Amino acid sequence: MSKNCPECGSSRVVEDDLYSQKQWVCEDCGSVVSEGLLTTTLSEESHSRAVPFFTSTAAFKKPCRNLVSGFSRLRALCRIFRLSSSMEDASANLFERAYNHPNFLHISLSKKQILAGCCMFHICRQNSWPVFMGTIGYLLDADNYQMGTIYQELTKSLNLQTTQVCITRMLESFCYDFKLAPDEVEEVFSVAQQRLVDQTSALLELAADTWILTGRRPFPLFLAAVYVAWQSLNPLARMKYSLMKFCKIAKAPEQLWCKSKDTINKRLNELLEVLCKLGRELPWVRPTDIQMNTVTTLVEDILKHRKALLILAVKHYEKQLEETQTSQYSESELSDSKSSVQTQCKSPPDEEDEGCELPPDHWGKRHLFLPPCVRTQKRQKINEAPLEVTGDEDISDSEIESYIRSEEEIKLFAKARKKICKY
């Protein structure tokens, strides 16, 4: 080959070792003279453009392993709930959008799996599919609070519009979890599925009219309503069975009642209390005979005349309230009673005021059925004083002895104590 540079015409062409490949390079202009390269001349090098590494390898980039595991978990959930292929694809697309969002890039793997469940839950809500968030959280082994926070963050980050599912459709799917068909349990316990759904939905409408359903999670109230409806369909034979016994008879899933027994019992007592208030307004029943353990025998009549009984109960309560107010105003020691009530309600912030009664002129006294936030008083926050620990506190002998375990340490401590006492 010629020893002259084709760019500048210089004859100062030397051999240069580049790693394991030898090249001929011009010393004057620096161009590569040897063949076999993409660019061999200085003019070609001047017109070239640098390409970033991530751009050159974008076509061959593999998806992240966390994204792949999230997709597999999402598709497994879709198969469990038997979603259609279109809903499954929509859930996968939504999960991919959420996964690449900056708010979800640096979260843990467990939270990314919860994010996949939240994406499927949102698609189910859009298609009016009756799926509970608690059921998805149970399958993902996630806390309800944690799943709720991630779902709220998902809707805020992607500007998603949440849709509400009809409570009757949710109730139907909930009632089918109880195995109460004639071929599954004894005849005493069996009930038609549609009849149970109708009775439970009527009880839920009553709960909504009396503010029991307001601001509450649906699971505990659903279970309490199903239990009361099951008892009311054959009260004489089923009154002796408790709520937990009913769950075992119906083979209800454990996630429905095991973790929230206290909440379910509270909703059950509230529902029975409302039924007792309305049952006392029935003209053929003596009010003294109405009790919470026997009111299920009157559920059919109460639900049949629900609207009329609600009006009668409110009217009788307002009438009794007017009579009590007139009797109080007729007393001569009215001012003393007001001052005593005010002094009773003034309690220090560190004490619970659950037993404190509201003053007579409070608006909550004028209504029979109230929302839960009005019926129950809020617990006052206890501001604990911070512990002032400086590290210079004296340590008692009993506390020192509690840290000693072996006999050798006791002997060493006794010797050291004797030496200290000598000085």
Curated annotation (Swiss-Prot):
GO terms for cellular component: nucleus; transcription factor TFIIIB complex; transcription preinitiation complex. InterPro entries: BRF2-like_C, Cyclin-like_sf, TFIIB, Znf_TFIIB. It is found in: Nucleus. Residues 325-358 are annotated as: Disordered. Keywords: Activator, Metal-binding, Nucleus, Oxidation, Repeat, Transcription, Transcription regulation, Zinc, Zinc-finger. The keyword Signal does not apply. One of its GO terms (biological process) is transcription preinitiation complex assembly. GO terms for molecular function: RNA polymerase II general transcription initiation factor activity; RNA polymerase III type 3 promoter sequence-specific DNA binding; TBP-class protein binding; zinc ion binding. Zn(2+) binds at residues 5, 8, 26, 29. Residues 325-340 have a biased composition (Low complexity). A zinc finger (TFIIB-type) spans 1-34. It holds the Pfam family Zn_Ribbon_TF. General activator of RNA polymerase III transcription. Factor exclusively required for RNA polymerase III transcription of genes with promoter elements upstream of the initiation sites. Contributes to the regulation of gene expression; functions as activator in the absence of oxidative stress. Down-regulates expression of target genes in response to oxidative stress. Overexpression protects cells against apoptosis in response to oxidative stress. Component of TFIIIB complexes. Interacts with TBP and forms a ternary complex with TBp and target DNA sequences. This is Transcription factor IIIB 50 kDa subunit. The lineage of its organism: Eukaryota, Metazoa, Chordata, Craniata, Vertebrata. The gene is brf2.
